[in-house]
């Protein structure tokens, strides 16, 4: 019984810690995206995203790219009202495929309301150390389901605790900052 309770407590703590680590590296991506140097505007979400799409088409004119938009959930709710949409989740990101026929929309409260962001999926880069490689072996880490966060536990008999070490070496960034467009929804 004690082992089950202990394992459950450790597992729940791990999940919360991993979520915090993932939120940190996602937050750093949003910070970089918010610093996009190009702009577009519209009176509502659909017009703003359409104008962002047009800017992407011009910027990436000679390239075959897939647009991706980052949108605040309140903007999506205000626009859609009671419409039926299907949201999906991968690596902690909530997204809608083919949103308004323009591309993938990632929905996050870390995006400022009325300030959607657009770039090409191909402009997004990631650098990371896999948590199943040499570093992980050195510290005896077990990778989470994404492979981006590693963890290990050690017991401390002096104060009867279980310490958890989490390690993550992840950085997401746009390759071209001027290929990131920040929209403004001005209202009607």
Report each predicted region and the residues it spans.
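Alpha-helix initiation/capping motif
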Residues: 1, 5, 62, 72, ...
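Short low-complexity stretches enriched in small and charged residues
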Residues: 1, 20-27, 82-90, 117-119
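Long, contiguous amphipathic alpha-helices that act as assembly "spine/axial" helices in icosahedral shell
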Residues: 1-41, 159-168
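Extended, solvent-exposed, turn-rich assembly/linker loops in the middle of proteins
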Residues: 35-105
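Sequence/fold signature of self-assembling virion shell proteins
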Residues: 90-188
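Unusually extended, aromatic-enriched hydrophobic runs near protein termini
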Residues: 24-44, 111-126
């Amino acid at each position: 019984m004690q082992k089950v309770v202990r394992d459950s407590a450790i597992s729940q703590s791990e999940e919360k810690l991993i979520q915090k680590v993932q939120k940190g590296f996602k937050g750093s991506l949003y910070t970089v995206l918010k610093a996009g140097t190009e702009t577009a505007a519209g009176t509502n979400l659909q017009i703003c995203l359409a104008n962002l799409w047009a800017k992407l088409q011009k910027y990436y004119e000679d390239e075959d790219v897939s647009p991706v938009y980052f949108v605040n959930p309140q903007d999506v709710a205000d626009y859609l009202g009671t419409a039926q949409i299907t949201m999906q989740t991968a690596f902690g990101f909530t997204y809608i495929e083919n949103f308004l026929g323009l591309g993938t929309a990632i929905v996050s409260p870390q995006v400022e309301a009325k300030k959607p962001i657009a770039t090409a999926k191909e402009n997004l880069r990631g650098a990371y150390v896999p948590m199943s490689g040499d570093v992980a072996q050195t510290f005896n880490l077990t990778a989470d389901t994404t492979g981006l966060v590693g963890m290990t536990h050690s017991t401390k008999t002096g104060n009867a605790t279980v310490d958890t070490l989490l390690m993550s070496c992840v950085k997401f960034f746009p390759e071209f900052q001027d290929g990131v467009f920040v929209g403004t929804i001005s209202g009607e």
